[in-house]
Amino acid sequence: MMSCEQHDYIEIACLYRYPIILTLTSGQELSGIAIDTARNEDKAECIKILADNTARLVPLAHIVRMKAASDNPHFDTVTFD
């Protein structure tokens, strides 16, 4: 389960609409702009990213790492439990 501190980094990425690279539990990497948090149809908490002009929901439970794709004062790489 993601800690409150880790969740804060998700919210910061969305607030500033940072370009990010997500590494999923499957090993897949997704790149996009963090735009919001939401729940999917299964009610799982997700981060909404914009990739190739398409919004996509990624369940937070599937994320093992989030890397900022641009320099910022808040974070570079965050690893999730």
Model segments located where?
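Conserved RNA-binding domains used in RNP assembly and mRNA/RNA metabolism
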Residues: M2-D81
